[in-house]
């Protein structure tokens, strides 16, 4: 009997010990898991999604790209990677500008655009030669320049971003009348009403999967070639030959955004157009048109100068009345 009691006591002791061990593990498991999660969040594998932003850096107006990048970087905590696209002779300049200014902290890659890809696809037009610059066509070739992203943000260099770039979505509103030459039968045959709302392709969030699936670049090149043959888009119309093919190809394939994310036409006239209060509330300002904020005359250039970083090499200078 004594032996029997001793065995039961031992078994009871082991049972109690097992329960204690289980309870101990349960109590201490939660903080252990939290610690692991904290480490994982800080590890490269679990970092927040990277936001690719494409901006062109053109000779003669490189300060525009710098100001745009500065405004984006200063107004977000997002993980932004800038793809700065330029021609071979401009890339060393923009690199030096970034590395010798407060922008040296940004994440960026420089991408060389080869203008030979446009050979035979652009019709010469002397009325607005600046619209024929090769970098105006970079947006046609986004999947060839940037490979690994589902979405890519493309911005013209004459913008200032006052909001958080994470909020940016897609869509604009203009009308097609100002871009396509409706005197041409080929344009009329498209069935696009002149009063149909269009978008401004200076601010784009592009779905790269659909772009590749629908062979958008090939479609754009087709309409470039048609213009060489038929002169469908005059440079005297808004945007010239770079914008018009995009309006045709993307007709009905885009969505709208909050108007504060694209306050445009600031470069259409040297006279003030918007109230200061409205401009302060705007998320993105766009000086599309002839009157650029680094030039003179221009409007609301103080909002642009807030983000401009002087060129360490002294090559780029703003033009002001007293300069």
Go through each PLM region and give its residues.
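Glycosyltransferase catalytic domains, chiefly GT-A lineage
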Residues: 1-323
